[in-house]
A protein has these predicted regions:
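N-terminal periplasmic "start-of-domain" segments of outer-membrane beta-barrel proteins
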Residues: 31-62, 89
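Extracytoplasmic beta-strand/coil segments of soluble accessory domains associated
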Residues: 66-108, 130
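Short acidic/polar hinge/loop motifs at secondary-structure boundaries
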Residues: 108-136, 155, 252
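Short strand-turn segments of transmembrane beta-barrel domains in outer membranes
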Residues: 138-141, 150-187, 198-208, 399
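Surface-exposed extracellular loop regions of Gram-negative outer-membrane beta-barrel proteins
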Residues: 180-218, 313-337, 343, 376-380, ...
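Acidic/polar loop-and-plug regions of large Gram-negative outer-membrane beta-barrel proteins
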Residues: 222, 229-288, 315-336
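Structural signature of Gram-negative outer-membrane beta-barrels, strongest in the C-terminal barrel
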Residues: 359-361, 367-369, 390, 394-522, ...
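Gram-negative outer-membrane beta-barrel transporters
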Residues: 415, 519-521, 541-627
């Protein structure tokens, strides 16, 4: 591979762009130890991929990060609007975002309560990213939570040798537009650098009325010294999207009505045209201060403080409502519109210290985060005036969550072998109390303590091939909906997984092969039951024993400097063992449980929902202007 560089590529629209001044970025940055402390490298035994964002800039047309990286092994994508703009979701080995840990510059991005990753809240982050690492399986420790399906690490602290000003615009189907303006001073003689970006993205979407209006800005004020770097980063995203998360019925799908959107009709109960303001409206602000030090003895330290602020709502039309559910003393029935709000803050600090010698390195790290959020609802309009006085908030509950994580990662190099011992301890407290939309009162206060040990070994056979193995244990706590869903049969339990990985990598002059075999044995895995909650999200339930096992393969081949081929394959078995499903029957007269008519179904082995057994990807790339 000495004369050939493989670049991932998928078919895209043509991008129109203009660059007033451009330059090559530095690839060696002093003191980026906060990234080194949480990422895997060539010494570590993990199944991972790294994408330099400059390799995919020709595809950066406004779509979310899941769309841009979906070609990696074992990844799936779904998107509400149908074109990758707006709400998009990523799955790794069949596991959704609630099991994927996402960090931006070492700062956890997953929502603290739902563990979801809302890419729509950070539109065009890809334009500010330097690289993205995707790690499959539980992997080694990171700041904050631990992923079960995988982890994604995004680095935006980019050093520019020269100043530049760049404007990019693109347009395409469904009235899609993207405009991005970026500028940087480059590193000035005194070591200062200011980098900024502003973006605007809009699209009408493939699905009916699934329009998106997305805006964001990014600012990084940096100082590069002889033995330190400092970054103050401020970013903000705003999204306004028409709701399109209700899905498509099998009947409509078979009829060919793939663009149908029932949002704004209250599942067909509203007469006339769909409600025009059935929107999701959310703002999110991120502040990060990152300080890195390189001491004279070669040791490295980092300190990061951060704050994430979120505020917004989604609005919907509800038909034939009992007004008593919208405030004590209200009476009557009729249609209304309401807004369901989320107002939250996340504060945190990360610290790490790394000692590196000729044959070993040791990284010790600790992180702490504190989350507080309010959930409340407001009635916008009663189309039939109720009897009584409406409340300003017809439900209100708050939540608090603390997460304390500490880990120590020891790497020892002996001849051709490299050993990694990673020990992580997490302590989580999650509490919430108040009223729900149905006026019921609830409260819970849960504490979790997790010990997550991991062991890795890699063996370098020669300069172009290596073998690695990984064995680890990890846990992840239940999320908000697991505690609150009305159909939950019992209090949810944390998930626990044992993960084994075996891999082989080989390079030739014009090609490269990667093979990875994995086995993941779960205790109390939370899996979808097939039911949905009041907002259409899948209801999850613990299953005692289950597993995910399979193989991943990647192959690159370079025919010439201009023509290359890339493919990957994912094959897996995803099964639940000894599963009991309870079908509860109700009496029509009073909806009480009919015990005699209820039944229990026992499964010795059944598939896990949303978990494919085969994912395949292939591409042939021709670059006529390559040298």
């Amino acid at each position: 591979m000495s004369n050939c560089t493989f670049t991932l590529f998928i078919i895209s629209l043509v991008q129109l762009g203009s660059s007033l001044l451009a330059q090559k970025d530095s690839t060696k940055i002093l003191g980026e130890v906060h990234i080194k402390a949480i990422r895997s490298n060539s010494q570590m035994a993990t199944s991972s991929s790294i994408i330099k964002t400059e390799e995919l800039q020709h595809l950066n047309l406004g779509q979310d990060i899941p769309t841009l990286i979906q070609q990696l092994p074992a990844l799936q994508l779904s998107t509400d609007a149908g074109n990758g703009i707006g709400y998009s979701y990523l799955y790794i080995r069949g596991m959704d975002a609630q099991r994927i840990q996402v960090n931006i510059n070492g700062v956890p991005y997953n929502d603290a309560e739902s563990q979801e990753v809302y890419w729509v809240n950070i539109p065009d982050l890809f334009s500010s990213a330097d690289d993205i690492q995707v790690q499959r399986g539980i992997g080694f420790s990171a700041m904050g939570g631990t992923g079960l399906g995988g982890s994604i690490s995004i680095k935006t602290t980019k050093r520019h040798l020269k100043p530049f000003l760049t404007y990019q615009t693109s347009f395409g189907s469904f009235n899609t537009y993207k405009n991005t303006l970026q500028a940087s001073t480059g590193v000035l003689p005194d070591g200062w650098q200011i980098t900024s970006r502003g973006s605007w993205i809009q699209s009408e979407g493939f699905v009916d009325r699934a329009w998106s209006r997305l805006g964001s800005f990014y600012l990084d004020v940096s100082k590069y010294g002889d033995r330190y770097t400092s970054h103050i980063i401020a970013s903000h995203g705003r999204e306004r999207t028409y709701q399109s998360w209700y899905g498509l019925s099998e009947e409509d799908y078979r009829a060919g009505d793939r663009q149908k959107n029932i949002a704004g009709t209250d599942y067909g109960s509203k007469a006339g045209e769909p409600f025009a303001n059935q929107i999701d409206n959310y703002h999110q602000t991120h502040l990060q201060w990152i300080q890195n030090f390189l001491w004279k003895n070669g040791q490295q330290s980092s300190l990061t403080a951060y704050m994430t602020r979120g505020l917004g709502y989604y609005e919907d039309y509800k038909a034939n409502q009992d007004f008593a559910n919208y405030g004590n003393g209200l009476a009557g029935f009729g249609d209304l519109t309401r807004q369901l709000w989320l107002d939250n803050y996340l504060y945190g600090v990360n610290a790490s210290h790394k000692i590196e010698k000729a044959q070993f390195s040791n990284t010790s790290a600790i992180s702490f985060s504190y989350y507080m959020g309010d959930h409340f609802g407001r009635v916008n309009e009663f189309f039939t005036p109720p009897a009584g006085n409406a409340l300003d908030r017809f439900y209100l509950n708050d939540a608090k969550k603390t997460d304390l994580t500490a880990f120590n990662k020891f790497v020892y190099q002996a001849n051709k072998s490299s050993f990694v011992l990673d020990l992580q301890l997490r302590r989580v407290n999650y509490s919430s109390a108040g009223s729900l939309r149905n006026q019921s009162i609830f409260s819970f206060d849960k504490n979790f303590t997790f010990f997550n040990p991991k062991l890795g070994w890699s063996y370098t056979i020669d300069a172009k091939s290596k073998f690695y193995s990984f064995l680890g244990l990890s846990h992840r706590e239940p999320v908000r909906s697991d505690f609150l869903d009305e159909d939950a049969l019992s209090q949810p339990r944390p998930e626990k997984v044992y993960n084994l990985e075996l891999g082989y990598e080989k390079k030739w002059t014009s090609s490269e092969l990667k093979v990875n075999v994995f086995a993941m044995y779960f205790i109390d895995q939370l899996v979808p039951t097939g039911n949905i909650n009041t907002v259409g999200a899948p209801i999850r339930q613990n299953v005692d024993k289950s597993y995910r096992a399979g193989a991943e393969l990647e192959w690159n081949y370079c025919f010439s400097k201009k023509l290359s081929f890339y493919m990957n394959q994912y094959l897996a078995a995803n099964r639940i063992l000894d599963y009991k499903n309870y079908l509860i029957a109700y009496n029509e007269s009073d909806y009480s449980v009919n015990v005699s008519a209820s039944e229990q179904i026992y499964y010795t082995s059944t598939s896990i929902a949303f978990s494919p057994s085969w994912i395949s990807y292939a591409e042939l790339k021709y670059s006529p202007w390559s040298h």
